[in-house]
Amino acid sequence: MIKAFLFDLDGVFYEDNQLLPGANTILEWLQEKQIPYRFITNNTTLPRKKLIEKLNRLGLKVIEDQLISANYAGVLYLKKQQVKRCRLVLRKAAKADYKDFDISSDAPEAIV
């Protein structure tokens, strides 16, 4: 029995700025069958919030709890390790996911 689905996004549900055929059909089927699903992505160029906005614009209805991004996983890990100060070597937009940390080049506890 299938308990849940975990989907990659880029190339599976969309390419470039276009939703792929059948993307919403599978999600509607999963909702009808009450099978939970989540999305994962290794995209580090956009903060999670902007990525969700992009997906919604494309027609893929995604809420925050359904998306696990590489940046979000990094944030969760750093919080679990009780890191307070980090240096970010990321695109400017992606840095928004790390807003709860003290961002500093001086004596960082982690470099992302």
Please place each PLM-identified region on the residue numbering:
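HAD-like aspartate-dependent phosphatase fold
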Residues: 1-9, 13-112
